[in-house]
């Protein structure tokens, strides 16, 4: 699992920061886990009701982030792309990653990178922050929580 070496995040006090979470719709079960983790991280940092915006897929995350970033202190982009048998995976991953990076650098607003780019469904489930259930041991990582914490910590640093 790639989470080895991750820093221990400090307890954040982001009360008063404006946060928007942009979530793609593909891979509903994984997306629900990512969104739950993002909302938990926001609450843990003192943000009770961040704005949530849904977009069709991960390819649409950058345009939504570009439009919304100027009005917020931090943006979190959540999506899932799972490799298939065509080059589509590489195109979407590259476009979304480059687009989100450009938004953050151009606007100066931190964009939490919660885009899972996985080779298979199991990798996505392992990173989705899902609780244990019958037949499922639970996720090993919570990338929605991590992306939100990173965006908020960076926003506080830049204040």
From Swiss-Prot:
GO terms for cellular component: cytosol; riboflavin synthase complex. One of its GO terms (biological process) is riboflavin biosynthetic process. 5-amino-6-(D-ribitylamino)uracil binds at residues 26, 58-60, 80-82, 113. Pathway: Cofactor biosynthesis; riboflavin biosynthesis; riboflavin from 2-hydroxy-3-oxobutyl phosphate and 5-amino-6-(D-ribitylamino)uracil: step 1/2. InterPro entries: LS (IPR034964), LS/RS (IPR002180), LS/RS_sf (IPR036467). Keywords: Riboflavin biosynthesis, Transferase. It catalyses: (2S)-2-hydroxy-3-oxobutyl phosphate + 5-amino-6-(D-ribitylamino)uracil = 6,7-dimethyl-8-(1-D-ribityl)lumazine + phosphate + 2 H2O + H(+). GO terms for molecular function: 6,7-dimethyl-8-ribityllumazine synthase activity. The active site is at 88 (proton donor). It is an enzyme of class 2 (transferase). (2S)-2-hydroxy-3-oxobutyl phosphate binds at residues 85-86, 127. Coiled coil: none annotated. Its EC number is 2.5.1.78. Belongs to the DMRL synthase family. This is 6,7-dimethyl-8-ribityllumazine synthase. The lineage of its organism: Bacteria, Bacillati, Actinomycetota, Actinomycetes, Micrococcales. The gene is ribH.
């Amino acid at each position: 699992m790639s989470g080895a070496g991750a820093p221990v995040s400090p307890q954040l006090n982001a009360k008063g920061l404006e946060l928007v979470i942009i979530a793609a719709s593909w891979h509903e079960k994984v997306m629900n886990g990512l969104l739950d983790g993002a909302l938990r991280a926001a609450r843990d940092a003192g943000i009770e009701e961040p704005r949530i915006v849904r977009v069709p897929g991960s390819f649409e995350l950058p345009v939504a982030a570009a439009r919304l970033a100027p009005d917020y202190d931090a943006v979190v982009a959540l999506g899932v792309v799972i490799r298939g048998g065509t080059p589509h995976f590489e195109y979407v991953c590259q476009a979304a990653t480059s687009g989100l990076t450009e938004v953050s650098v151009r606007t100066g607003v931190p964009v939490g990178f919660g885009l899972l780019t996985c080779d298979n469904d199991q990798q996505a489930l392992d990173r989705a922050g899902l609780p244990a259930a019958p037949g499922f041991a639970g996720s090993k990582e919570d990338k929605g929580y991590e992306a939100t914490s990173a965006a908020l910590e960076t926003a506080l640093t830049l204040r």
